[in-house]
């Protein structure tokens, strides 16, 4: 274990609460990977899906989350090229192939796996209301639709990570 600048040993992380706010493939996976890693290390984990991050747990959208190709600096692709029809699907397909080689499951399977590991999955009530959604619009692994205040209650005593 490493030591801090003052020579003390840092306290181990016991709980993380991860906010997933983006609905693109590269916006959803970091939160899922971090939650999965936390559970594998025995760390309590909660995922709070808000705004377009709700796509990852939406019955209608979770199987079709794509890479955002327009204006994505990580792709090193001209903005105009990212907007060409089919580019997002092509890049998403290629990335999915690479993730499969690394045993990284598709979003629906990953969400199920993380929930089965004991992590909590929650939808943001404000975002659910904003988009006119209902509890029934989400996959069964979602434990509840909660307010920001309730999320802070769940996160108390742990680390909050915004992806």
Protein language model features and the residues they cover:
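Short, glycine-rich nucleotide/cofactor-binding loops
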Residues: 18-28, 57, 98-102
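Histidine-anchored nucleotide/phosphate-binding helix
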Residues: 29-42, 47
